[in-house]
Amino acid sequence: MSARDIVAINREFYDALWSQTYVERPERFNTWPLISGLLPSAPLRLEIGPGLRPRLPIAGTHFIDISTPVVAKLKARGGIAAPGEITALPFGDETFDLVGAFDVVEHIEDDRRVFAELGRVLKDGGILVFAVPLHARFWTEFDACVGHARRYEPADLLALLADHQLVIEKSAGFGMQPNNPRLLKYGMKWLTQHRAAAMRWYNWVFMPLGMLFQKRLKFRPGLVDPAGLAEIVLVCRRLPR
């Protein structure tokens, strides 16, 4: 699949997903204890590809998203939102103290360019918080449906970070995707055959239920043992130039 095809799949899927739902408050996510602890030293903030589930506080944060409904709704809530892509961020070098990108990087074919851009806009010593799915062996129809270009092998991810002067401070297992094969297969059937109805159920039933049953993130210094993890969230610091 070409990079252009992946972008088109992402835009079509997420425009439809976000066009008829609401902005969730960042404070409701299990990432909030982490994010809120970073805010005092992060006056300049950017979140990329938040959808309507931002993890950084909306007011005063810059947001970049490919989805038009997302940009409009975040602006209405006080965010500094603009359309754009993670491979060409419309900001100068060394702009931000904190950058977030949750479930975004895996959607981009040219991930080296992604990390080059993330490292470019971060100040020296700035923090990158991002989440990606792990292990090609866990690839499912869902990955293809939502526009994933890959799932990461831990060694490849470590090499990418090192190449772009990003050092892992801590990490944890992450994600809300169901791991029950039958449930996933049933969900995929609805997504492919009854997409509009499936998205309504996701936005108004399954996502709210998932929020109620979120588990506390268990961070470990450096890279948490990735064996068996389907997804990971990492806190990285930008080394001085």
Per-region residue spans from a language model:
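Residues lining the SAM
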Residues: 102-105, 131
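Short glycine- and Lys/Arg-enriched binding-loop motifs that mark or flank ligand-binding interfaces
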Residues: 45, 122, 143
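Short, cationic motifs built from Arg/Lys/His that form the positively charged side of catalytic pockets
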Residues: 31, 120-123
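Conserved N-terminal segment of class I S-adenosyl-L-methionine
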Residues: 1-94, 98-102, 112-115, 172-174, ...
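S-adenosyl-L-methionine-dependent methyltransferase catalytic module, highlighting the catalytic core
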Residues: 3-13, 17-29, 109-117, 127-239
